[in-house]
């Protein structure tokens, strides 16, 4: 019995309890769904979908919409919830999961097992359980997101692309997700232009764009060196959120990097500082700004203080360690710099910039012969 199992299975007991009560149509089902979705210790975001689906199937569509809307405030990127929001709005008669159907409940338990196996990198066995889950509930297309990711992890890219293509036909949110994942594969296959075209066209076709989709599109453009275009989308978001919005620090960081890459440093600096003002403990933003100052030969002492903080936040990150060592080098504290730059080389031996920095500090410390190699 589950009650006799280790404490680690407490969450599974909660899931079992909800599904058992729903299966037997017990009056407390609604309350149990509320309790599990309000749990702050564990990510039960998926169960907001099950709760909304249960409520909708009971004829309470407006209540189901409210459940989804409230959940999306906490989990704005949740794929299941985003797609179900669209389905409810369009009044699609879809009941991909019904906790009163034994096969659906068993399929979900098999999915939980598959997900756990995937997290342990046991991808083939994970897909075995996913296939069983899909057999028991062929309408629950969310299973395919994990299966495609498993195939991607074992480098079966064609199979992953095929699943994403099929998944993309199941709704607008699924289509956007599938386009991004397919683009990742296309870039890996050296088909960057095709990837950009796919994501751009899919984004433009979205009827229900939200700021998170716009942010993802801006990030995709920036990461693929479409800096000017990305700035336009970052700016759209900044104009529509306040400084306390969770995305604000990320958007100003992204736009700041894009500005820096096209040579507009004053705009970049302003955005990066705004990002840190909104969220001061972003190690990588601290590193990006401080390293940029160091490269320009300005604010070296301030950069050092910032990088020491970044190093405390991310003590084993080679990029931050390299930046910290380089700041010490610029301040002519060569012996201290050597220790950090040597550590950075050990963590990232193939990086040419890190190796150049280490070579420079070796030279300054009198290790001319070693520096040559």
Labelled PLM ranges:
Residues 6-16, 40-50, 61-63, 74-82, ...:
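Generic helix N-cap/helix-start motif at coil->alpha-helix transitions
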Residues 6-7, 56-80, 86-89, 168-170, ...:
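TPR/TPR-like (Sel1-like) alpha-helical repeat modules
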């Amino acid at each position: 019995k589950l009650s006799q199992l280790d404490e680690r299975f407490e969450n599974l007991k909660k899931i079992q309890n909800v599904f058992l009560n729903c299966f037997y149509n017990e009056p407390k089902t609604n309350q149990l769904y509320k309790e599990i979705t309000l749990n702050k210790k564990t990510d039960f975001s998926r169960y907001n979908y099950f709760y909304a689906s249960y409520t909708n199937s009971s004829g309470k569509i407006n209540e189901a919409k409210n459940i989804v809307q409230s959940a999306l405030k906490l989990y704005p990127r949740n794929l299941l919830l985003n797609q179900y929001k669209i389905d409810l709005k369009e009044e699609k008669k879809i009941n991909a999961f019904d906790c009163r159907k034994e096969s659906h409940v068993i399929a979900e338990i098999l999915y939980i097992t598959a997900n756990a196996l995937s997290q342990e990198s046991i991808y083939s066995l994970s897909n075995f359980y996913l296939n069983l889950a899909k057999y028991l509930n062929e309408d629950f297309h969310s299973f395919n997101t994990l299966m495609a990711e498993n195939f991607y992890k074992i480098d079966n890219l064609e199979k992953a692309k095929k699943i994403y293509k099929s998944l993309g036909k199941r709704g607008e949110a699924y289509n956007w997700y599938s386009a991004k994942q397919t683009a990742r594969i296309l870039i890996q296959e050296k088909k960057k232009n095709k990837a950009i075209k796919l994501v751009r066209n899919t984004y433009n076709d979205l009827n229900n764009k939200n700021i998170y989709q716009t942010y993802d599109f801006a990030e995709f453009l920036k990461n693929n060196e479409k800096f000017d275009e990305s700035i336009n989308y970052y700016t759209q978001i900044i104009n529509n959120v306040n400084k306390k919005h969770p995305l604000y620090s990320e958007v100003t960081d992204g736009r700041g990097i894009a500005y820096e890459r096209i040579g507009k440093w004053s705009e970049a600096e302003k955005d990066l500082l705004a990002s840190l003002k909104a969220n001061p403990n972003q190690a990588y933003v601290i590193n990006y700004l401080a390293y940029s100052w160091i490269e320009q030969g300005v604010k070296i002492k301030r950069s050092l203080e910032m990088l020491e903080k970044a190093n405390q936040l991310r003590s084993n990150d080679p990029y931050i360690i390299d930046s910290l060592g380089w700041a010490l080098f610029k301040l002519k504290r060569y012996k201290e710099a050597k220790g950090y730059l040597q550590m950075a080389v050990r963590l990232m031996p193939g990086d040419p910039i890190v190796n150049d920095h280490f070579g420079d500090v070796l030279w300054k410390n009198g290790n001319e012969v070693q520096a040559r190699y």
